[in-house]
Each structure stands twice: as structure tokens, then as C-alpha cells.
UniProtKB/Swiss-Prot annotation:
Organism: Homo sapiens
UniProt-recorded name of the protein: Synaptonemal complex protein 1
Protein purpose: Major component of the transverse filaments of synaptonemal complexes, formed between homologous chromosomes during meiotic prophase. Required for normal assembly of the central element of the synaptonemal complexes. Required for normal centromere pairing during meiosis. Required for normal meiotic chromosome synapsis during oocyte and spermatocyte development and for normal male and female fertility.
UniProt gene name: SYCP1
Transmembrane segments: none
Keywords: Cell cycle, Cell division, Centromere, Chromosome, Coiled coil, DNA-binding, Meiosis, Nucleus
Length: 976
């Protein structure tokens, strides 16, 4: 082993803070082996353990410690160079002056260099291991970040598609809610139709309308709501049975109407017979009246004969009345006067007994006349009873005829006026009865007349009862009409809503509805003919059908009219009740008066029996009777006039009755015609029902097909949604697991980073200690520089030829266009992250004179591509250190991109060393200059390493693209 010759690296002073040029000397440009040996020796002997730092791919300094950033790594090179120069000068001077002193200095420096190399080997091994770990962790973090970004994009796409699916589900839910609402409406329509059928079962015309409405409703239900096929079939069957029942009921009603018509015809014939009988009876009554008049004339003649005797008796009666008045006064005053009057009465009785014998003969004749009158009265009573029975039968029949309300109300008013007149007459008659109480004959005639008036009153009562019954029937009719109106209005409103909702589905059925409306119009016309009183109502109903918007107003008007009618009816009822009460009161008064009159008559009879004894008094009474006979004849004339009036009234009543019978006959004929029309309509309705049944069958088949299709579609959608939900759940589970793993990895990496920071702090402290030692060595070297300036150039040239060549590692493709000196630390001195320019400072020239042979190191400007890459690198990576190996291109003088320093990560250099079967420690060992130059990296190997790295990056990019495409395809399949 030959001794290494002393060598020194002369570095000129730094021209600027931005660039340091490293250029080979022009004289020795062709001798490449010289520089190779020099580089090799410098690499083996002066690799510092503290001078290398890792740079990122974009050339960023990753050292996060600000203390290290302040360290200027180029002065370290100057220190080493100066120390080597001083060491070399010392050796040269030692040849001349003291070889022993120089050898000692050299040996010391050599030992220190060996110690530094050993410490460097250990620290570099540790740092390389840590940096390899850090780089692996960085790659993992970058891959995880890319995966997270891809997952985020995928999650956003999935979220968008999920939102679209949710909106579609919401739309489906809305459609389902709409169908449910329609189903509820259908159920309500079914319930309402059932209620209407129950209401209109008892009426023929309304049952037909309900029949047609139900058929229309069934067709609407089938076309509009396909999902309710089973319910529609059940309702159809039920309605079919109901229609059969209704048809049977209609036939039954037709038979009943025919029977009623026959019965009414028979009744009319009976009424005509009864009218003839009544006319005969009236003729008999008129004949009896004439006979009674003759008898009255005879009685008047007899009364004229007896008038003379009666005058005498009347005079005596006046005297007796005066005496009776005196007696009454005396009876009130004292009892003594009564006894005297009793004695006078006994005397008078004796005289009357003689006179009674003469008057008995006259009384017998009068009794015979009375018996004849009583017989006539009994005959009248029997006729009156028969007439009452006939009137009752007529009342029952007239109750059935419900169309005479207005006429009867007018008659009621007339009869009420007649009743008032009759009440006045009764009052007059009561006065006359009080006047006729005094005489028995007069009272008998008045009783007869009162009986006749009672009969008339009873007839009026019968008419009142008939009118009351008719009023009740009319009230029922009005109530039924009100119910019908309300039902029709509700039905019209309901059907108008249904028509608005189902216009699109019921275009084919509009023709049928128009036909039905025409039938309804015909029926309404028939109802007009049948019921003249309800003509206004039917016109309003037609207007309601034509103008649905005006229905409400017309209904309100009708309701007001009905209320007015009800009020009038209530008023009439109140008036009738009031009249009834008055009649009852008058009857009671008449009965009381009659009872009183009967009692008075009995008393008078007793008095007559007593007074028959008094002949003189009877003669006076006969005179008075003659006078009263003339008055009675006048009254009889008055009564005859009244009887004539009553006969005229009877004739008018007969005429009215005839008119009523004619109207009934006309109504019966109209009803027959309407029944024929209705039968024709029933046949048409049957034909329409058969057609509807056929349509229902066809619609049922269509409903089944559509329902099957809808069920299949819904099942497909359900399966697809279930699959989508399962896949999304699995993806979410995977994402959660990946996130947990990443969080755990981040935590571990943070722990490792904290440990590395602690180690770096310890390394910084050691560096500071070594710097202090080197400063001491510099001071010692400066003292020796003054004596060795002249000999320095020659010795350095000879030494440079002998020194081995060393390669600095170069990887131009890891970070292009950046040059860094070997074992120098790249530190970013306060410059921004977007403008990371790495400044290389040249060593200060410690010598007084510049050296002719020197290297210039230039740092180029950053290209645009590097700036773009710097933006994407995270902040944490910019603060981490990274060691780099440098290699110079010695064959060039310029500072072009090929001459500039390039950086290669320590991790890749280690890989190349392992591939070349060179352990990492061999790169760090100390070698003598006599050994063969073994360059660790060649230009071909560096190109291979760059190509391999590119291939790996391309593979990773292709794999990432394939994964993205697969994920996108899977996400698209979920929503197809």
C-alpha cells in the first residue's frame, strides 16, 4: 500500500448567492482518468455524515428544522478544502524544513478523517434506513390519497345517483298516494251510491235514475281504477241482483198502479151513483120542506083561532108576571109575605084547575102536531147520518188525491169566511133562542133549526178534516220533494266532481250520458204533466241540469220558497187550530145553551102543567103566540132564503166535484201514457245494461293483463333496488374499513415522524460540535498559509494527477435540471414554497491569490414543469430531509443542462447497489489511490434505473386507470 499523496481542492469565492459554477480546467480537459481518480478519492476520503439531505422529486428541501435550514453547507466544503490544502502545503514544506512535523500533522488529520468516516458510515446507514422507511410511507400516503380522492369522486357520483333514485322513489310514493286517494274516493262513491239506492228504492223514477247512475259509476270504477278489479266484480254482481229486484219491484208497482187505477175508476162510478142518490135525497128533502110549510100554514090558521084565547091568557100572564115579580121582591124581603102569596097561589090553583080541563083538549091537538114534527126530525137525522158516512168515505178517497192542495187552500179561505158568517149567524140564533125559551112551540121549531145548523156544522167539520188531511199529505209531499232536491243537489255536486276528475277516461261514455239526460228530461216533462203544482220545481231542476253553476242560487231560492210555503202552512194550521178551538168553544157553548134550554123546557113543561090550570093565563099566552107566529113566519121566510143559498152552494160543490173527477180521469189517462213510455224506457235500459255487461267483461280482461304487467314491473324494480342497496351497503362497509386502516396508518406514521424529528435534533447538536472543531482547524491552517503560497500551485497540480477519480451519483430523471455538490445539504433559506430555488454557495477562498484551476458550480433556473409539480406536493413533504448523491460531467466546460448537477434519491442508489451485488457499505469504505478505480454508477446504469422507474410509474398509472374504469362501470350498472 503506497501512501496517499496530499491533495487540496481549491474552490474560488462565490460570485453570487444564486448560482455557483463548477467548470473543469481547460488544460486538463482530455485526461478524464485524472478527474475520475480525484472524484473517487474525494468520495472515499471526505464523505461527511452530516452533509447529505434528502430532496423531494421537485428539488424541495424536506428538513423541517429551522436550525438546519440556517446551516450553510458550502462553507463546510471550504473548510474541508482548506484543511486539505493546508495539509498538502504542510507536507511540501516538511520536505524542505521539517518532515517530521508535517508527518505528525498528516497522521493526525488522517486519523481524524478515519474517525469521521467510521462515524459517517454508521450515521448514514441509520439515516438511509430511516429515509427508506419515510419514502415508503410517503408512497403509501400518496397512494392512499389518490385512492381517497377516487373514492370521494365515486362517493359523489354514487350520492348523485342516490339522490336521483330518492327522487324517483319520491315520485313513486306520490303516485302511490294519488292512487290511494283515488281508491278512497272510489270507496266513498260506493258508500254514497249504496245510500242513494236505499233512499230511492221506494220511488219508480228515482230508482231508474239511480240504476243508470250506478251503471255509469261501475263503468267509471272499472276504467279509472284497474287495481280494484275484485271489488268492481263484487259490486257489479250486487248491483245486478239489485237491478233484478228493482225490475221486479217496478213490475209490482205497475201492477199496483193498474189496480189503483181500476179502483179509482170504480170509486168514480160509485161517486157518480152517490151523487145521483144525493140529488134524489135532496129532492125528497125539498118535498118534505114543502109539506112542512103546508103544515106550518095550517098551524098558523090554528094559531089565529087560538090567538083570541091566547090574548086573554097573555093578559092574565102579564098580571101573573107582575105578581111574580112582586112575590120575588117580597120573598127577598120577608118570609111573611111568602106565606100570604102561597095562600093566594092556592086560591089561584083552584081556579086554574077548572081552566086546565078546557085546555087539555087543545094541548092534545098540539101534542099530535109535535109528534108529527118529531117523526120528520128523525127522518132528517137518518138522512144526515147516511150523508155523514158517505162524506167519511169521500174523505178517505180524497186523502189519496194529493194534487188538490192549492184549490183546497182557496176553498179553505172561502170556508173560513163562511164559517165566520156562520158564527155570526149562530150568535144571532143564540139571541133568538133566548127569546124563544119562553114558549115551547117556538123552542121546538128553533131546536129543529138548530139541529139543521149542527148538521151543517158537522159537514163543515168534515170538510175541515178533509182539508187537514190534504194539508198533511201536501206537507209530506213537500217534505219528500225537499229530500229529493237535497239528494239531487248532492248527487249533482258529487257527479260533477267525478266528471271533472275522469274526463279523459269517460269520453266514450258521454254519448250515453247525453241519452240519459234526454231520458231524464222526458221524465221531467212527464212529471210536469202528472204534477201541475210542481211545474216550477221541475223547471228549476232542468235549469240546474243545464247550468250547474246556477244550481246553488236556484236551490237557495227553492229553499226560501219552501220555507215560505212552510210558513204559510204553519199559519194555515194555526188558523185551522184557532178555528177548531173557536168551533169547539161554540159547540160547548151551544151544548150548554141547549142543556140549559132543555132544562128550561122541562121547567117550562112543569110550569105549563101547572099553568094549564090557569086558563086565563093561557088565553093571554095564545094572544102572545099569535103575535110571535107572525114573527116566526117572517123567520121562516128568512130560513127559506138561507136554504136556497145552501142549495146553490150544494150545486156549486157538485160542479166542483165533477171538475175534480174530470181532472182525476185526465190524470189517470196521462199516467197510463207515462207508464207506457216508462215501459219503453225500461226495455231500452235493459239493452243498455246488456251492453254494459259486455263492456265490463272486456274491461275486466284488460284490467287483469295490465295488473299482471304492473306487478311484474314492480317486482323487477324491487329486485333491482334490493341489489343496489346490498351493493351500496357492502361498498360503504369497505370504505369504512379502508378509512379505519388509513387512520391507523396515519397514526403510526405520525409517531414515526415524531421519533425521526427527535433523532434529527440530536444529529444537529452533534453537527454544531463538529463545526466548532473545524473552526479551530481553520485557524491553525491560516497561520501556515502565508509561508506556502508560492509552492502551492505546482504541488496541487502534481497531486491532482495522482489522486483517484470518484463518481458522484447522478439520476437525471428523478429530479431534472438541478445540480448539487457531493455531501452538501440542500436547505431552503426562507424562500416561499412556490419559488423553491436551491442556492449553492461556493467556498470562500481562504488564500490571498486566486487559483488558476477551479470548478464553477451553476444552479439552473427551475423549469415550468417543476413549478407545476411543486404545487401538488403537500406541505409536510416539503419539510422532510432527503439525501442526494451528485455526479459531475467532467468533459464539458459550459454550465448547460448536461453539465449541471442532478439529484437521485438515496433509495434508488441503494437498489442499484444491491442489483450490482455491491453492498452499501462498500460505497463508504476508505480506499487508497493505488486501487483500481471502481465507479459505482455508470451512465448506462443510471439510464436503466430511470427507465425502470418510468415503467413502474406507468404500470401504476395503468392499474389506477383500470380500477377507476371498473368502479365507474359498477356504479353505472347499479342505476341502469
Amino acid at each position: 500500500m503506497e501512501k496517499q499523496k496530499p491533495f487540496a481542492l481549491f474552490v474560488p469565492p462565490r460570485s453570487s448567492s444564486s448560482q455557483v459554477s463548477a467548470v473543469k480546467p481547460q488544460t486538463l480537459g482530455g485526461d478524464s482518468t485524472f478527474f475520475k481518480s480525484f472524484n473517487k478519492c474525494t468520495e472515499d476520503d471526505f464523505e461527511f455524515p452530516f452533509a447529505k439531505t434528502n430532496l423531494s422529486k421537485n428539488g424541495e428541501n424536506i428538513d423541517s428544522d429551522p436550525a438546519l435550514q440556517k446551516v450553510n453547507f458550502l462553507p463546510v466544503l471550504e473548510q474541508v478544502g482548506n484543511s486539505d490544502c493546508h495539509y498538502q502545503e504542510g507536507l511540501k514544506d516538511s520536505d524542505l524544513e521539517n518532515s517530521e512535523g508535517l508527518s505528525r500533522v498528516y497522521s493526525k488529520l488522517y486519523k481524524e478523517a478515519e474517525k469521521i468516516k467510521k462515524w459517517k458510515v454508521s450515521t448514514e446507514a441509520e439515516l438511509r434506513q430511516k429515509e427508506s422507511k419515510l419514502q415508503e410511507n410517503r408512497k403509501i400516503i400518496e397512494a392512499q390519497r389518490k385512492a381517497i380522492q377516487e373514492l370521494q369522486f365515486g362517493n359523489e357520483k354514487v350520492s348523485l345517483k342516490l339522490e336521483e333514485g330518492i327522487q324517483e322513489n319520491k315520485d313513486l310514493i306520490k303516485e302511490n298516494n294519488a292512487t290511494r286517494h283515488l281508491c278512497n274516493l272510489l270507496k266513498e262513491t260506493c258508500a254514497r251510491s249504496a245510500e242513494k239506492t236505499k233512499k230511492y228504492e221506494y220511488e219508480r223514477e228515482e230508482t231508474r235514475q239511480v240504476y243508470m247512475d250506478l251503471n255509469n259509476n261501475i263503468e267509471k270504477m272499472i276504467t279509472a281504477f284497474e287495481e280494484l278489479r275484485v271489488q268492481a266484480e263484487n259490486s257489479r254482481l250486487e248491483m245486478h241482483f239489485k237491478l233484478k229486484e228493482d225490475y221486479e219491484k217496478i213490475q209490482h208497482l205497475e201492477q199496483e198502479y193498474k189496480k189503483e187505477i181500476n179502483d179509482k175508476e170504480k170509486q168514480v162510478s160509485l161517486l157518480l151513483i152517490q151523487i145521483t142518490e144525493k140529488e134524489n135525497k135532496m129532492k125528497d128533502l125539498t118535498f118534505l120542506l114543502e109539506e112542512s110549510r103546508d103544515k106550518v100554514n095550517q098551524l098558523e090558521e090554528k094559531t089565529k083561532l087560538q090567538s083570541e084565547n091566547l090574548k086573554q091568557s097573555i093578559e092574565k100572564q102579564h098580571h101573573l108576571t107582575k105578581e111574580l115579580e112582586d112575590i120575588k121582591v117580597s120573598l127577598q124581603r120577608s118570609v111573611s109575605t111568602q106565606k100570604a102569596l102561597e095562600e093566594d097561589l092556592q086560591i089561584a090553583t083552584k081556579t086554574i084547575c077548572q081552566l086546565t080541563e078546557e085546555k087539555e083538549t087543545q094541548m092534545e091537538e098540539s101534542n099530535k102536531a109535535r109528534a108529527a114534527h118529531s117523526f120528520v126530525v128523525t127522518e132528517f137525522e137518518t138522512t144526515v147520518c147516511s150523508l155523514e158516512e158517505l162524506l167519511r168515505t169521500e174523505q178517505q178517497r180524497l186523502e189519496k188525491n194529493e194534487d188538490q192542495l192549492k184549490i183546497l187552500t182557496m176553498e179553505l179561505q172561502k170556508k173560513s169566511s163562511e164559517l165566520e158568517e156562520m158564527t155570526k149567524l149562530t150568535n144571532n140564533k143564540e139571541v133568538e133562542l133566548e127569546e124563544l125559551k119562553k114558549v115551547l112551540g117556538e123552542k121546538e121549531t128553533l131546536l129543529y133549526e138548530n139541529k139543521q145548523f149542527e148538521k151543517i156544522a158537522e159537514e163543515l167539520k168534515g170538510t175541515e178534516q178533509e182539508l187537514i188531511g190534504l194539508l198533511q199529505a201536501r206537507e209530506k209531499e213537500v217534505h219528500d220533494l225537499e229530500i229529493q232536491l237535497t239528494a239531487i243537489t248532492t248527487s249533482e255536486q258529487y257527479y260533477s266532481k267525478e266528471v271533472k276528475d275522469l274526463k279523459t277516461e269517460l269520453e266514450n261514455e258521454k254519448l250515453k250520458n247525453t241519452e240519459l239526460t234526454s231520458h231524464c228530461n222526458k221524465l221531467s216533462l212527464e212529471n210536469k204533466e202528472l204534477t201541475q203544482e210542481t211545474s216550477d220545481m221541475t223547471l228549476e231542476l232542468k235549469n240546474q241540469q243545464e247550468d250547474i253553476n246556477n244550481n246553488k242560487k236556484q236551490e237557495e231560492r227553492m229553499l226560501k220558497q219552501i220555507e215560505n210555503l212552510q210558513e204559510t202552512e204553519t199559519q194555515l194550521r194555526n188558523e185551522l187550530e184557532y178555528v177548531r178551538e173557536e168551533l169547539k168553544q161554540k159547540r160547548d157553548e151551544v151544548k150548554c145553551k141547549l142543556d140549559k134550554s132543555e132544562e128550561n123546557c122541562n121547567n117550562l113543561r112543569k110550569q105549563v102543567e101547572n099553568k094549564n090550570k090557569y086558563i086565563e093565563e093561557l088565553q093571554q099566552e095564545n094572544k102572545a103566540l099569535k103575535k110571535k107566529g107572525t114573527a116566526e113566519s117572517k123567520q121562516l121566510n128568512v130560513y127559506e132564503i138561507k136554504v136556497n143559498k145552501l142549495e146553490l152552494e150544494l150545486e156549486s160543490a157538485k160542479q166542483k166535484f165533477g171538475e175534480i173527477t174530470d181532472t182525476y180521469q185526465k190524470e189517470i189517462e196521462d199516467k197510463k201514457i207515462s207508464e207506457e213510455n216508462l215501459l219503453e224506457e225500461v226495455e231500452k235500459a235493459k239493452v243498455i245494461a246488456d251492453e254494459a255487461v259486455k263492456l265490463q267483461k272486456e274491461i275486466d280482461k284488460r284490467c287483469q293483463h295490465k295488473i299482471a304487467e304492473m306487478v311484474a314491473l314492480m317486482e323487477k324494480h324491487k329486485h333491482q333496488y334490493d341489489k343496489i342497496i346490498e351493493e351500496r351497503d357492502s361498498e360503504l362497509g369497505l370504505y369504512k374499513s379502508k378509512e379505519q386502516e388509513q387512520s391507523s396508518l396515519r397514526a403510526s406514521l405520525e409517531i414515526e415522524l415524531s421519533n425521526l424529528k427527535a433523532e434529527l435534533l440530536s444529529v444537529k447538536k452533534q453537527l454544531e460540535i463538529e463545526r466548532e472543531e473545524k473552526e479551530k482547524l481553520k485557524r491553525e491552517a491560516k497561520e501556515n498559509t502565508a509561508t506556502l503560497k508560492e509552492k502551492k500551485d505546482k504541488k496541487t497540480q502534481t497531486f491532482l494527477l495522482e489522486t483517484p477519480e470518484i463518481y458522484w451519483k447522478l439520476d437525471s430523471k428523478a429530479v431534472p435540471s438541478q445540480t448539487v455538490s457531493r455531501n452538501f445539504t440542500s436547505v431552503d433559506h426562507g424562500i416561499s414554497k412556490d419559488k423553491r430555488d436551491y442556492l449553492w454557495t461556493s467556498a470562500k477562498n481562504t488564500l490571498s491569490t486566486p487559483l488558476p484551476k477551479a470548478y464553477t458550480v451553476k444552479t439552473p433556473t427551475k423549469p415550468k414543469l417543476q413549478q407545476r409539480e411543486n404545487l401538488n406536493i403537500p406541505i409536510e413533504e416539503s419539510k422532510k430531509k432527503r439525501k442526494m448523491a451528485f455526479e459531475f460531467d467532467i468533459n464539458s466546460d459550459s454550465s448547460e443542462t448536461t453539465d449541471l448537477l442532478s439529484m437521485v434519491s438515496e433509495e434508488e442508489t441503494l437498489k442499484t447497489l444491491y442489483r450490482n451485488n455491491n453492498p452499501p457499505a462498500s460505497h463508504l469504505c476508505v480506499k487508497t489511490p493505488k486501487k483500481a478505480p471502481s465507479s459505482l454508477t455508470t451512465p448506462g446504469s443510471t439510464l436503466k434505473f430511470g427507465a425502470i422507474r418510468k415503467m413502474r410509474e406507468d404500470r401504476w398509472a395503468v392499474i389506477a386507470k383500470m380500477d377507476r374504469k371498473k368502479k365507474l362501470k359498477e356504479a353505472e350498472k347499479l342505476f341502469v
